[in-house]
Design a protein with these regions (language model features):
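Active-site neighborhood of phospho(di)ester-bond hydrolases with catalytic His/Asp-centered motifs
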Residues: 28-29, 50-57, 76-80, 127-130, ...
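Short Gly/Pro-enriched turn/cap motifs at secondary-structure boundaries
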Residues: 6-8, 104-107, 127-129
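Active-site HxH/HxHxD metal-binding segment of metal-dependent hydrolases
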Residues: 34-121, 203-206
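Metallo-beta-lactamase
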Residues: 122-206
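Conserved beta-strand hairpin/beta-sheet module of binuclear metal-dependent hydrolase folds
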Residues: 1-45, 137-149
């Protein structure tokens, strides 16, 4: 089950809960702001959060991490290149927007790793640099879902002008890593309503 929660910090951003219906255990993906609201959802739905996952290291995707980590006592996972952003307020854009924010002590994953919730629920890491050098999507083949961060949105692509961004890499990631997923894969992004691989390919004339 996927729960979508819009959170409002400096930017509005979508945080996601990936939850087992049977056990109520779950993962939080990109908790950008409003930690108290997210904690209320966890309590009201009887959820047990095992891990916090980041699709990339911009502050609007990790703004609620520290409070959640303290309250939930769970690890925070990010790509092996994420410290370029998580430890640098200029790179993660917090200094320019809200004041310095950093995240330390994250567990690192890499392309191809599987992040397991239980035997029936897991997410595979697919490396998609371009928006940032640490950007990933988190994919479940059986359920045909992917949490794509800011790599792609409905009928648009991620920003590549921020520090570390690269237009050519972003387009390559979309074409070679994202658009090769099944057309019915639902894409959950950081700043737009869900779309599908097939819908985006059609939008771009493919």
């Amino acid at each position: 089950m996927v729960l979508t929660v819009p959170v409002k910090g400096y930017f509005e951003e979508y945080c996601y809960f990936y939850v087992s219906d049977s056990t109520r255990h779950g993962l939080i993906i990109d908790p950008g702001a409003q930690a108290d609201q997210l904690l209320d959802i966890i309590r009201d739905n009887g959820l047990v959060i095992e891990k916090i996952l980041l699709t990339h290291g911009h502050f609007d995707h990790f703004g609620a991490v520290e409070k959640l980590r303290e309250k939930l006592n769970c690890p925070v996972l990010a790509h092996e290149k994420a410290d370029l952003f998580l430890l640098d307020p200029l790179m993660n854009l917090s200094r320019q927007c809200v004041g310095d924010m950093i995240i330390r002590d994250t567990v690192k994953f890499k392309d191809g790793d599987t992040i397991a919730l239980d035997e029936a629920h897991s997410l595979r890491v697919i490396y998609t640099p371009g928006h940032t050098p640490d950007s990933v999507l988190l994919y479940n083949e059986k359920e045909r879902i992917a949490f794509v961060g800011d790599t792609i949105f409905k009928e648009s692509i991620g920003n590549y002008t921020f520090p570390g961004g690269n237009k050519d890499l972003l387009i390559q990631s979309i074409m070679e890593r994202l658009f090769t997923l099944p057309d019915d894969t639902v894409l959950y992004s950081g700043h737009s309503e869900p779309t599908t691989v097939g819908a985006e390919k059609r939008f771009y004339g493919m």
